[in-house]
């Protein structure tokens, strides 16, 4: 059985790992970049083609394809080099209809991303076959539907909150905690699944954890206080009523604050043990979150105050931000931003209007690092809530698993 490279404080160092087949056939394990990938329908091997890409693509499906996040999944997968979109699925009222008849397209660019005539399927593994399933379902239906796909052999990359805090489910930001994919062997063994579930965090947590990771790695975190100013797109379409949000700030988003406070610690924690003995250990610092809704279309802006070990200076914190090397460096992941964290020198940045679309919406932009008389350091962080915080995050998770050769056991 293959193991992991040792991890640093709270598991934030990048890791090399392989997950063996469930039957323990170590001879089938793949350990080098030149090795093949398991096929997607029958056990033969699809070898890498020119440029290191495999000659066959993994079959992908989108659950909840008619919603705003589902549409972003469709647009991202439309021309993906490694994944082929073969099925769109939604609720019973949409199943059986052409995609263009099941929903209105709410994104820029080509309407329905070329899939307008595809027939929408039911959210059931009996309705279609897919190697990868990208879930934009709400949490309640996700709790029943996602395990059905995982049990049948699909790998589910979920934007839903249903399984994020489960002990055997990775809550992944590829740049920060790629080693957490190692929990999948335990997940599959204990649940008896042929496939698996991998989750991405809440859209606010993605921004916060990405900003905190360099500080945890460089200094260690003692406490965090955060206030979010969250875009209306985070409420879905049609979202918050214009009568409620225009010229207003709504100081409450249901269930948002507990999600942020619990998820960040899991992401910044570490994976202990190997194989079926692996367990996730959360980072042990207190985090207080206040989440608000503001009249911005896209982009969550956070004000963050943090107490760090050793009381580093502003210059040292800025150096930690600028010097952060993500786990994904050198992997060539299709959806990875050219620059994951960018620290702005402008006193009035980041701004959603000017910064949120950077690197296809996958960049986290930081700014205004300064002393905090209460906590020690404070700064601003910004990220795209429906790309970096939703569809783009799940697709990037799948690309990481693919690059790390974790997807060898898909059917």
Describe the function of each predicted region.
Residues 2-252, 282-286, 358, 364-365, ...:
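N-terminal Rossmann-like NAD(P) cofactor-binding subdomain of oxidoreductases
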């Amino acid at each position: 059985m293959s193991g992991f490279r040792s991890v640093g404080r709270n598991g934030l160092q990048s890791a090399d790992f392989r997950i063996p087949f469930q039957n323990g056939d170590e001879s089938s394990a793949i350990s080098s970049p030149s090795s093949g990938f398991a096929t997607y329908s029958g056990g033969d091997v699809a070898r890498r083609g020119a440029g290191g890409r495999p000659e066959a693509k993994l079959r992908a499906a989108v659950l909840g394809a008619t919603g705003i996040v589902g549409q972003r999944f469709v647009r991202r997968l439309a021309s993906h080099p490694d994944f082929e979109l073969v099925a769109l699925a939604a609720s019973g009222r949409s199943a059986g209809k052409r995609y263009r008849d099941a929903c209105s397209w709410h994104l820029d660019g080509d309407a329905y991303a070329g899939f307008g005539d595809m027939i929408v399927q039911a959210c059931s593994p009996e309705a279609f076959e897919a190697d990868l399933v990208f879930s934009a379902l709400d949490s309640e239906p996700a709790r029943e539907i996602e395990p059905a796909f995982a049990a049948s052999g699909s790998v589910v990359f979920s934007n839903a909150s249903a399984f994020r805090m489960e002990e055997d489910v990775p809550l992944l930001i590829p740049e920060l905690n790629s080693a957490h994919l190692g929990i999948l062997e335990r997940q599959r063994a204990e649940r008896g699944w042929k496939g698996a579930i991998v989750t991405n965090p809440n859209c606010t947590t993605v921004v916060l954890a990405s900003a905190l990771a360099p500080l945890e790695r460089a200094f260690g975190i003692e406490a965090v206080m955060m206030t979010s100013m969250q875009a209306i797109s985070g409420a879905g379409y049609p979202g918050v009523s214009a009568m409620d949000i225009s010229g207003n700030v709504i100081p409450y988003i249901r269930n948002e604050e507990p999600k942020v406070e619990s998820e960040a610690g899991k992401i910044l924690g570490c994976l202990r043990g190997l194989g079926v003995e692996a367990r996730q250990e959360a980072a042990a610092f207190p985090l207080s979150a206040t989440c608000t809704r503001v009249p911005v279309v896209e982009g969550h802006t956070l004000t963050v105050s943090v107490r760090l070990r050793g009381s580093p200076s502003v210059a040292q914190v800025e150096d930690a931000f600028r010097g952060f090397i993500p786990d994904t460096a050198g992997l060539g992941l299709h959806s990875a931003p050219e620059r994951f964290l960018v620290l702005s020198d402008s006193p009035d940045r980041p701004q959603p209007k000017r910064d949120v679309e950077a690197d296809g919406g996958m960049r986290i932009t930081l700014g205004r690092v300064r002393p905090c008389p209460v906590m020690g350091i404070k700064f601003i962080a910004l990220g795209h809530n429906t790309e970096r915080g939703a569809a783009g995050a799940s697709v990037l998770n799948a690309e990481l698993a693919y690059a790390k050769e974790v997807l060898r056991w898909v059917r």
